[in-house]
């Protein structure tokens, strides 16, 4: 399942991750995989108001993976596709597995 959610980007020089954002969480963390939607759940403390959740997502990914991100799709949706710039698929999968799944 994780190989369907995480894939190499052809034009962004990074790794694409399909995520579902759960805002207003107690802490920022990687959650489980939503198998029905085929998305990795990311829990974020910020509310989705005025782009605050998207900024929090960028900070969280920078802290977790040490890489910058681009929100490729879903800027105003809880379902997003994120590109982790300069990362490898194995690197991302290893860090996700170590963090929670």
UniProtKB/Swiss-Prot annotation:
GO terms for cellular component: cytoplasm. SMART domains: DUF167. Pfam families: DUF167 (PF02594). Disulfide bonds: none annotated. Belongs to the UPF0235 family. This is UPF0235 protein Maeo_0841. The lineage of its organism: Archaea, Methanobacteriati, Methanobacteriota, Methanomada group, Methanococci.
